[in-house]
């Protein structure tokens, strides 16, 4: 009996903000690796999720939502998104079925037209939000001035519809290759990064619009106190004292709520009880200061 071949490769997930890229990655990996929020631009780094089967390994690069940059952080995010295209063995372009094709989609498509030889998939996400008879017109709208899609997949990342079939298909397009990561590894980011992202997710979900894009999280300490408990200290970084006041909340209610929700997710991730301490610190205009960006982990050499 001939030995079965092992396939592997890198898949870039790209799309404008809030089309469901992080939801799709988390659906595939089965853990919260990329944060999810209804706020735009929640994904800031090229988070790698790893999907492994007996005969294949796919490393997913979930890119920041493409938008017109307003500051140095925005420039970093957009540069990060498009650099992924040059690292990938396949590209998934995700669009929102419930929204018409827009200028953000056109901008991405113009860049995809420059890509040659790499398979490019069109993923019509959130099909659970539309009537079945609307689907054909949506697909046709993305054929205009666009590359020839290798495959077109209607999916629902939230419900999981058509996602297993999508995975089988992309594996069929990959070449024979090595297993880059251990079978039980879900991401190449360290625990500190993932824990920080879980905390930032709760800030995004619970605070007002003026706060989210100004928030970063630094994990100051992770220490195992005993076999069943982990002590974590984290700093939530904002740009203005008013934002600090919002995150702390009246009599500390908001920061307590953020900590409680984050702790539950971190405990699921770590498999142990967690004692989480959080502080809020003001770093004026950190998004426009290259040194601050590097200190807070937005270093292009690492991504």
From Swiss-Prot:
<keyword id="KW-0694">RNA-binding</keyword>
<feature type="region of interest" description="G3">
    <location>
        <begin position="62"/>
        <end position="65"/>
    </location>
</feature>
<comment type="function">
    <text>An essential GTPase that binds both GDP and GTP, with rapid nucleotide exchange. Plays a role in 16S rRNA processing and 30S ribosomal subunit biogenesis and possibly also in cell cycle regulation and energy metabolism.</text>
</comment>
<feature type="binding site">
    <location>
        <begin position="15"/>
        <end position="22"/>
    </location>
    <ligand>
        <name>GTP</name>
    </ligand>
</feature>
<keyword id="KW-0963">Cytoplasm</keyword>
<feature type="region of interest" description="G4">
    <location>
        <begin position="125"/>
        <end position="128"/>
    </location>
</feature>
<feature type="region of interest" description="G5">
    <location>
        <begin position="155"/>
        <end position="157"/>
    </location>
</feature>
<feature type="binding site">
    <location>
        <begin position="62"/>
        <end position="66"/>
    </location>
    <ligand>
        <name>GTP</name>
    </ligand>
</feature>
<dbReference type="Pfam" id="PF07650">
    <property type="entry name" value="KH_2"/>
</dbReference>
<dbReference type="InterPro" id="IPR009019">
    <property type="entry name" value="KH_sf_prok-type"/>
</dbReference>
<keyword id="KW-0690">Ribosome biogenesis</keyword>
<dbReference type="InterPro" id="IPR006073">
    <property type="entry name" value="GTP-bd"/>
</dbReference>
<comment type="subunit">
    <text>Monomer.</text>
</comment>
<keyword id="KW-1003">Cell membrane</keyword>
<dbReference type="InterPro" id="IPR005225">
    <property type="entry name" value="Small_GTP-bd"/>
</dbReference>
<dbReference type="GO" id="GO:0070181">
    <property type="term" value="F:small ribosomal subunit rRNA binding"/>
</dbReference>
<feature type="domain" description="KH type-2">
    <location>
        <begin position="207"/>
        <end position="284"/>
    </location>
</feature>
<dbReference type="InterPro" id="IPR005662">
    <property type="entry name" value="GTPase_Era-like"/>
</dbReference>
<dbReference type="Pfam" id="PF01926">
    <property type="entry name" value="MMR_HSR1"/>
</dbReference>
<dbReference type="InterPro" id="IPR015946">
    <property type="entry name" value="KH_dom-like_a/b"/>
</dbReference>
<dbReference type="GO" id="GO:0005525">
    <property type="term" value="F:GTP binding"/>
</dbReference>
<keyword id="KW-0699">rRNA-binding</keyword>
<dbReference type="GO" id="GO:0043024">
    <property type="term" value="F:ribosomal small subunit binding"/>
</dbReference>
<dbReference type="GO" id="GO:0005886">
    <property type="term" value="C:plasma membrane"/>
</dbReference>
<dbReference type="GO" id="GO:0003924">
    <property type="term" value="F:GTPase activity"/>
</dbReference>
<dbReference type="InterPro" id="IPR004044">
    <property type="entry name" value="KH_dom_type_2"/>
</dbReference>
<feature type="region of interest" description="G1">
    <location>
        <begin position="15"/>
        <end position="22"/>
    </location>
</feature>
<protein>
    <recommendedName>
        <fullName>GTPase Era</fullName>
    </recommendedName>
</protein>
<feature type="domain" description="Era-type G">
    <location>
        <begin position="7"/>
        <end position="176"/>
    </location>
</feature>
<keyword id="KW-0547">Nucleotide-binding</keyword>
<dbReference type="InterPro" id="IPR030388">
    <property type="entry name" value="G_ERA_dom"/>
</dbReference>
<dbReference type="GO" id="GO:0000028">
    <property type="term" value="P:ribosomal small subunit assembly"/>
</dbReference>
<dbReference type="GO" id="GO:0005829">
    <property type="term" value="C:cytosol"/>
</dbReference>
<feature type="binding site">
    <location>
        <begin position="125"/>
        <end position="128"/>
    </location>
    <ligand>
        <name>GTP</name>
    </ligand>
</feature>
<feature type="region of interest" description="G2">
    <location>
        <begin position="41"/>
        <end position="45"/>
    </location>
</feature>
<keyword id="KW-0342">GTP-binding</keyword>
<keyword id="KW-0472">Membrane</keyword>
<comment type="similarity">
    <text>Belongs to the TRAFAC class TrmE-Era-EngA-EngB-Septin-like GTPase superfamily. Era GTPase family.</text>
</comment>
<dbReference type="InterPro" id="IPR027417">
    <property type="entry name" value="P-loop_NTPase"/>
</dbReference>
């Amino acid at each position: 009996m001939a030995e079965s071949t092992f396939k592997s490769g890198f898949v870039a997930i790209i799309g404008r903000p809030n089309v469901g890229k992080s939801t799709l990655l988390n659906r595939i990996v089965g853990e919260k690796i990329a944060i999810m929020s209804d706020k735009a631009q929640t994904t800031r780094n090229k988070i790698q999720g790893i999907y492994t089967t007996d005969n294949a390994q796919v490393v997913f690069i979930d890119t920041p939502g493409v938008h017109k940059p307003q500051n140095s952080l925005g420039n970093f995010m957009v540069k990060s998104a498009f650099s992924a295209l040059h690292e990938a063995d396949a590209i998934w372009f995700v669009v929102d079925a419930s929204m018409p094709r827009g200028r953000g989609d056109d901008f991405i498509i113009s860049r995809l037209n420059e890509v040659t030889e790499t398979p490019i998939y069109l993923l019509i996400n959130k099909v659970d939000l539309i009537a079945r008879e609307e689907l054909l017109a949506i697909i046709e709208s993305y054929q205009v001035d666009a590359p020839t899609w290798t495959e077109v997949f209607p999916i629902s990342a939230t419900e999981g519809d058509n996602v297993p079939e999508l995975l089988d298909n992309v594996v069929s397009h990959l070449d024979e290759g090595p297993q880059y990561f251990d079978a039980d590894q879900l991401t190449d980011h360290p625990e500190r990064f993932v824990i920080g992202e879980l905390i930032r997710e709760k800030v995004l979900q619970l605070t007002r619009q003026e706060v989210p894009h100004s928030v970063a999280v630094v994990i100051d300490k992770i220490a195992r106190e005993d076999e069943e408990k982990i002590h974590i200290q984290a700093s939530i970084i904002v740009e203005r004292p008013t934002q600090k006041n919002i995150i702390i909340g009246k009599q500390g209610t908001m920061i307590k709520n953020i900590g409680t929700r984050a702790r539950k997710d971190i405990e699921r991730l770590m498999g142990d009880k967690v004692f989480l301490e959080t502080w809020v610190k003001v770093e004026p205009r950190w998004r426009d200061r290259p040194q601050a960006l590097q200190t807070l982990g937005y270093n292009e050499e690492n991504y």
